[in-house]
Amino acid sequence: MSRHDSLYFADGTLTLQDLDGTLFNVYRHHFIAKSGFFSGMLTLPSPDQPTPIQNASNGISDSTAVPLPPNFTTVEYEKFLNFIFNVGSLDIPLVTDLCAILKTSHFFAAESGVQYAVHYLQAHANFPAALRFRMGCDYSIVSWVKAAFDDLVAVPVIDMTVEDEALLGTQAFRALVLTQAKVTDHRMSLAVCPPLPTHATWCRNPAYCQTQWESAWTSIAGPLGWLIKEELSGAEIHNKLDLWVPMAMTGECRLLTCSRLKEDLKREEVIIDSAVTALIRLVVV
């Protein structure tokens, strides 16, 4: 056994021990107030009820330390207790720290820890899509599952790591591959059969306008090029269409035609949403 360097308080009133033999000495009342799990375990019962913690592990000394559940590592317990007792600085929390706090806080019914971790992970720039998906599944955060799957659809399978695949799991990875194939088929059908331009009522030269549209379409810098780029999501293509100005095409005709193309692209959203809905029923806890 060894005492933790920063989480063994000299005036602590509750000694805890993890599976690796690390001892933590913390403040019992504060711990009970923060964690529903420990509140139920450590609160003294009425006189006619048995004590939940026997004398052999009552937490009043190192030799009678309360054993912590073996579900988490010493590092994960550190992150959890650092948060609970406000030890150290988490001004710019790392994704790994936040995930550890979410996992432990969820298990120990520490609502403030769950809210803290979710709040910072939600907008964290370095929260990988595969990890977001896994955490969303494990902790029933459906919005994370959807957002992560949307992002992953735009990632070629060949670029995914073994770690990504492990985080997704077999069912989700298979659903992702099938969804990517359906999206690709839909995009290719649009690419090889470009929509006819929609002309404004006052378009003076529809034939010329159509020629300009077809010429711009076949450019790799236009819609055709965007459709064959797997790394572009449907939303990104929508944004590009809003800014795209093919040469010499009447402005109103361009807007009408791009609007129609956006409607065709919405089929991609339906494909992805259907896959996510089915997946959530299977993998979200």
Spans of features found by a protein language model:
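BTB/POZ-protein C-terminal extensions
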Residues: M1-P67, S89-L90, N126-V285
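Long, hydrophobic/aromatic-enriched structural stretches that serve as scaffold segments
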Residues: N58-H119, H199, C203, A207
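Long, hydrophobic, well-ordered secondary-structure blocks that form the structural core
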Residues: L121-A123
